[in-house]
C-alpha cells in the first residue's frame, strides 16, 4: 500500500497556494524510472499527490493566468471540479516511448479553488466560458491598497 496523502481528521482545512500550476503540480503524477532494459517503469510507490489532493477538504489558491497558460491544465481543472473526482495520470508527453503505466482509480475530492486575477480576465471567462460560470460563482474584489487597521 502507498499512502500518497493523509489528513488527520482533527486538522484544520488545508490552504494550499500553488505558485506553479503545471499539470503535474496540480493533479499529481506517476513518476517513472528508466530501467536496465531500456524502458520506463513505474509502480504504485511512484504516485505523487498534486496541489488539488493536498488541498482536499480545504482551499487551493492560484493565479488564474498561470493556470490558463499551462497546457492541459484548464480543461482538466474544469473536469475535476465539475465532477469532484481527481485522476492522477502519468505525463505521457514526457515519456512517449514508455511502457504500461499504473492507472489508479479516481479519487473523490472536496476542494474550493480560489483564482487570483484581474477583472478583465474574469469578465472574459465569465462571458465566454460556460463552465467558468458554473464553477466560480463568487467574485470578490479588493483594493490594490488598503489602510492598515488595528
Q: What would you call each of these model-derived segments?
A:
Residues 1-127, 131-149:
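Conserved ASCE/P-loop NTPase catalytic core
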